[in-house]
Regions:
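Non-transmembrane, aqueous-exposed alpha-helical and coiled segments at domain scale
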Residues: 1-119
Length: 119
């Protein structure tokens, strides 16, 4: 599952402004999709990467579950054609990452790449 804690950390540390989400089409068969939004270790909740890596050795992911879209999206060519659940999923990931998700792929072919902000 998508680990929003680690992605947010990587985006901050590396000064990212945008992300790409690939293989969104692969999730189309799932009734629900989980996103790791925090970790729990020894009764403490971590919503950011802990200062000491050793915490991860015993940490358990805390997931938020979103509804899946359960349909084929491989023919979608722009963000607005995606099912509402897929758009909500991307928006949720973007909010957690703290940066834009500007590229989304819905298959292996070049024309299956959606540039969300290009007009």
């Amino acid at each position: 599952w998508y680990d929003a804690v680690v992605v947010n950390y990587a985006a901050r540390v590396n000064g990212l402004t945008d992300l790409a989400i690939t293989k969104l089409d692969v999730l189309g068969c799932l009734p629900e999709i989980k996103v790791c939004v925090a970790y729990e270790c020894d009764g403490k909740r971590y919503e950011t990467v802990p200062e000491h890596q050793s915490v991860f050795y015993h940490a358990k992911p805390i997931y938020e579950t979103l509804p899946g879209w359960e349909c084929d999206i491989s023919d979608v060519r722009n963000f607005y054609q995606l099912p509402r659940e897929a758009k909500d999923y991307i928006d949720f990931l973007e909010q957690l990452a703290g940066v834009r998700i500007s590229i989304i792929t819905v298959g292996p072919e070049r024309e299956q790449t959606i540039d969300r902000y290009w007009r």
